[in-house]
From Swiss-Prot:
Major localization listed first in the record, in broad terms: membrane
Keyword Zinc: no
An annotated Gene Ontology molecular function: proton-transporting ATP synthase activity, rotational mechanism
Its biological purpose: F(1)F(0) ATP synthase produces ATP from ADP in the presence of a proton or sodium gradient. F-type ATPases consist of two structural domains, F(1) containing the extramembraneous catalytic core and F(0) containing the membrane proton channel, linked together by a central stalk and a peripheral stalk. During catalysis, ATP synthesis in the catalytic domain of F(1) is coupled via a rotary mechanism of the central stalk subunits to proton translocation.
Protein name: ATP synthase subunit delta
Membrane keyword on record: yes
Similarity remark: Belongs to the ATPase delta chain family.
Gene label: atpH
One GO cellular component term noted in the UniProt record for this chain: proton-transporting ATP synthase complex
Organism expressing this protein natively: Pseudomonas putida (strain ATCC 47054 / DSM 6125 / CFBP 8728 / NCIMB 11950 / KT2440)
NCBIfam families documented for this protein: ATP_synt_delta (TIGR01145), PRK05758.2-2 (NF004402)
Bilayer disposition of the protein: Peripheral membrane protein
Length: 178
């Protein structure tokens, strides 16, 4: 995974800098999101891995599938990625682009996993507290996992806060083993 990120980073950075310079961050985010989804299709993956096709043929087919959703610069980006055999990295490129975009917009996506469903009031309160702690606008994404037993696990970028009962039991078990 780290290797994929290393390979994808220059492409994501170049796309981000171009989009930022032309004030098209949202447009490029949408185009890269579409490209990532298309590249994950099983049929498209087989095509992209086919050794008998040239990079130009792969790029042309990829662009044809996406239709008129790509502007000329995005089509050029796909051609460059194809020439360097990086079309399969599009999901990672799109994820990094969105990370750069979120940093630029001073916002962060926060994944909150709880043992039980959080109501809207709880989500709003949690988002407000996290926004104050992180100093950024928080976009909260809530999910449930009954195996947590109780509590929540919060993931915001590299930050992980494990306030789950399962996590506390695991820490206790580790302490008892020591």
């Amino acid at each position: 995974m780290a290797e994929l990120t290393t390979l994808a980073r220059p492409y994501a950075k170049a796309a981000f800098e171009h989009a930022q310079a032309h004030q098209q961050l949202a447009n490029w985010s949408a185009m890269l999101g579409l490209a990532a989804a298309v590249s994950q299709d099983d049929t498209m993956q087989r095509l992209l891995k086919a050794p008998r096709l040239t990079s130009a043929e792969k790029a042309a087919t990829f662009i044809d599938v996406c239709g008129d959703k790509f502007n000329a610069q995005a089509q050029n980006f796909i051609h460059v990625a194809a020439e360097n055999d990086r079309l399969l990295l599009l999901p990672e490129i799109a994820a990094l682009f969105d990370l750069y975009k979120a940093e630029q917009e001073k916002s962060v996506d926060v994944e909150v996993t709880s043992a039980f469903a959080l109501n809207q009031e709880q989500q709003d309160k949690l988002a407000k507290v996290l926004s104050a702690r992180l100093g950024q606008e928080v976009r909260l994404h809530a999910s449930e996992d009954a195996s947590l037993i109780g509590g929540v696990v919060i993931r915001a970028g590299d930050l992980v806060i494990d306030g789950s009962v399962r996590g506390k039991i695991a820490k206790l078990a580790e302490a008892l083993k020591s």
